[in-house]
Amino acid sequence: MNKKSNKKKSLFWWLLSSFAVLVILLEGFLYYNPTAYPQPLFRWMFIIQNGIKAFGFRSDVGLREMSKIIASSTSLYETVVGYAYTLVIFIAPLCTAVAVYTVIKNVFPIKSVKWLFINERNIVVFGYNDAVKRLVSTREAKQRIHIVDATLSQAEEINLLKNGIAVHKEDCLNLKGKQLAKFASRIKLRNTTEIILFDESSAKNFSVYQMFHKEELKEISQKGLKFFCRCEDEGMKRIMEDYHDEKRLEAKDLEFISIPELRIKAMLEKHPLHTYHSSVYMEKEKWNTEEYKTWNLHLLIVGFGRLGQQLLLQAMNMGVVSSENDILIDVVDYDMQNKKSFFATHFNDNYVKFDDAKNEIEITSEKADGTFKIRFHNMDIRYQQFTTLLNEIGAPGADGKGLFNYIAVCIRDMDLTLGCMAEIEKYLNRYKDVIKEREVSVGVRLEANRQMAEYVRRNNGTFRNVFVIDDPEKVLSLKTLINDELAKDAKIFNYIYSTLSFDKPDSPKPEDAAKPLTVLVEEVWHCKEMYKRNSNRAIAQHDAVKQMLMVKEVKDKLEAYFGENGELLQDQGNYWTFIERDENKLIDKLNDAKEYPWVSEFVKLEHRRWCYFMASCGWQSVDNFYQDRDVAQKANACMCNWNELSQKGEKQGKKEPKSYTCKYDLMPLLKTYLDTKAK
C-alpha cells in the first residue's frame, strides 16, 4: 500500500515539475521575443537563466513585470500563459525542494526529519540488544523512539539514525542535578508516555527506574507515565516490587516483562490447556457441573529451562477448569536436580508439599480443592529410557496417570528436539484409537531453525497436531506491549474487587461513585500493591477459560443475579451492594448448589485457581484462621479449600472469619455481567 502511494506522489510531482518547465519556457519565449532580443544565442541564454532562477524563487521575470504584461496584453494566448506563469513562480521552488529532499533521502536514507513536523507519541527505550531491535522494528508511523545506551557502536548509532530513531549515547545513571534535567529535556520526558527498560541486566533496569523517582525528574514527567521493565530474575523482581509498593502512592506505574512468559501466554491463548476436551465439546444450553470435573490435565514438559518453567507456572493458573479436575504435570530434563532446586524457590514449603524421595511437588486437597501434582524426571531423552517413561506414565488407564493430553517440547537444541518429536509421534500413534477425534496439542520450540519451523507449520498432517511455539519476534512488539488488552481487563477486575466492600469503611463514597468508570479504574489501580496487580492479571488471563465454560443458561441469568434488583448482588452503578447486609447469608447462597449450581461451582473454581496462583508466587497459608494477611511474610489465611473458607464464625475482637472474602470469587461473573451490560 505504501509503495503504491509513493509511486502516485512521485508521478504527481513529476507532472507538476514538467508543467512548470513548460510554462516557464513559453513565457520566456514571449518575454524574450526576437524583436527585443534579436541575437538567438543570448535570447536562449536569457530564457534558460530565467527558468533556473524561477525554480530557485528568484526569477528574472517577476510578478511586477507579469502584472504589466497581462494588463497591456491583447492576446488571449499571452494572457493565459501569463496567469499560468504567475502560479508557476510559486510552484517551481516547491518542486525544487521535493527534488532535493528525494535526492538526500536516497543518498542518506534518514527518516528522522519528519518528527520535527508531526506530533508523535514519545517512547524512550533504555538498553540496546536483540529484544530492543525487535521492538524498534515494530514502530508505527506516529511513534517517536529514543534509544538510550552508552555502549552503542558507531555503526549501530548510524543505522538507528537512518531509521528515524533518536540516539542518546550516554550513561544517564551518572548524571546529577542540572545535567539530569538537561537529559530529561533531550529525551522529551515531559511528553513521554512510555519508558521501556530493556537492558539485559535487571539490576540496571531497576537503577534507571529509581532514577526517575528523583526530585529532578518527578515533577517533569507525566502523571500517567508508564514503565515496562524487562526482568526474568525472580530475586530482582521481588526487590523491585518491594520498592514500588513502598512508594506506590507516588511511584510510577510499573509492569514487568518476561519474554518466556510472553511466549507461553501467546501459546496458551492459541492452544489452551483444555483443548483435548474442548475439541469434542459441544456447547450446551444447561449447566453440567460434573462434566467439567472430568476435564483432567496431564501435561508433559520436555526441557526445564526458563520456557518450560514458565509453562508450568502458567499451567497452575490456566489448567483449572473446575473445582475438582485433576492436574498432573510431568517434567523431563537431563539436569533436573539443579533446575528443580532453582524452580522450588517459587514455592513456600509451608503450603506446597515437597517429596524429595519421589521427586514430586504436591498441593494437597487440605490446602486447596482438587488435586495438583508435579513429577520431575531426570534423564537424557536420547536414550531408550525416555520411550519407556512415556509408556509408563502416559498409558491410558494407568493408576493415577493416564494419557498425556498436552505436550510441550521446550528444548533449545535442534537435534534433541527433532529426536524427541519422533518419539512423541510414535507415542501418539500407539494410542490413536484412544485419542480418536480429540486433539493432543504438541508445542515445540524451534526458533533456532526457522526453516524447520516453517516445515512443521506447513506439514501439520505429518506432525499431527504439532504447532511451533512463537519465537520472541512474533510476541514482542510495541503495539502489544502498550495496548495490552489483558492489562485493561486486569484493571477492571481490580476495580470490581474494590467495590465489593459492602458496609466496610473503605466502600466507595458517593462522590467517588459519581466519577466516570474509566477514572475510577485508573485511580484504584495506581494505588495497588504489585502482588494485587499480579493477581488481577492472572484472573484476567483465566477469564478466557471461564468464558468457554459459560453456557447459555449462565449468560441468560446474569441480570437476574447481579442486576439492579439481583438475587445475589445489586448493581448500584459504580459499586455493588448486598441488600441483606449479612455476609453469612450470601455464603449460604453461594454454597447452595441446588438453587445456584453454576454460581456455586464458579466461585469454588475461582477460589481454587487463586490458591494455586498465590502458591506459584511463594505465598503460604496460616494456622490461625483469624489472622490478618501478612504481605511481608507472604501469608494469607484464605489459602485453604472452599469448605474451610466458607466456615461461619463470630467476630473475635477486631478479627473476623475469612468467610467474608468468599464474595471476591464472584468477580469473574460480575466482569461478564458488566461486559454484557455494556453491549
Q: Which residues are covered by each model-predicted region?
A:
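Cytosolic regulatory regions of ion transport systems
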Residues: 2-23, 33-46, 53, 59-610, ...
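A glycine-biased, small/acidic residue-tolerant capping/turn segment at secondary-structure junctions
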Residues: 622-630
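Short, flexible domain-boundary/linker segments around small modular repeats
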Residues: 631-641
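C-terminal, surface-exposed recognition/capping segments
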Residues: 666-675
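ATP-hydrolysis module of ASCE/P-loop NTPase motor domains
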Residues: 26
